[in-house]
Amino acid sequence: MSSNQQPVVLGKLGSCHGIKGWLKITAYTDSVEGIFDYSPWLIKENGEWREVKVIQWRYQGKAVVAELEGVTTRERAQMLTNCEIGILPEQMNDLPEDEFYWRDLIGCEVINTNGYNMGVVDQIVETGSNDVLLVKANAKDSFGKVERMLPFVPGQFILKVDVQGKQILVDWDPDF
């Protein structure tokens, strides 16, 4: 992995399962199985990313557990508990033109149709009905806002997303 590539975090390793080094998996993917579509994984252990392969995985009750290459004892698995699971950015699936990964939206400037800079996307929240952009307002916001919440509804409030230019054009009143 080159030093300028930041892995995309897809989950984390949980507690041990059994005595043969299996670990519970917490996945941040849409479905828990989705994390197993990617191989190899990168594991962040002691601040360093290293490559690891999943040998096999299965459901264990309501949890998902996995056997990782080179992890054959409970003691070794315990050393990996709470380590992040990542992949290289180029391992991500290509998306249709009007879909975006959250990581690509974070850091984008949000500009309304009147040209007002509303701030920068700080994080995104999944609400069930639609995602919501949490926009950190500029230090000298004319409306005294610190943060804004904008529904990510393309065509209604989100007019254009320029991932390369790191800008999102919105139809939204900055005072709301």
Swiss-Prot record:
Role: An accessory protein needed during the final step in the assembly of 30S ribosomal subunit, possibly for assembly of the head region. Essential for efficient processing of 16S rRNA. May be needed both before and after RbfA during the maturation of 16S rRNA. It has affinity for free ribosomal 30S subunits but not for 70S ribosomes.
> What residues form the membrane-spanning segments?
none
What is the name of the gene encoding this protein?
A: rimM
- The residue range of the signal peptide is none
Q: Does the keyword Chaperone apply?
A: yes
What is the protein's given name? Ribosome maturation factor RimM
**Keywords, ordered alphabetically:** Chaperone, Cytoplasm, Ribosome biogenesis, rRNA processing
Intracellular or extracellular location(s): Cytoplasm
Top-rank lineage group of the source organism: Bacteria
Q: Does the keyword Chaperone apply?
A: yes
Source species of the chain: Shewanella sp. (strain ANA-3)
Quote the subunit structure annotation. Answer: Binds ribosomal protein uS19.
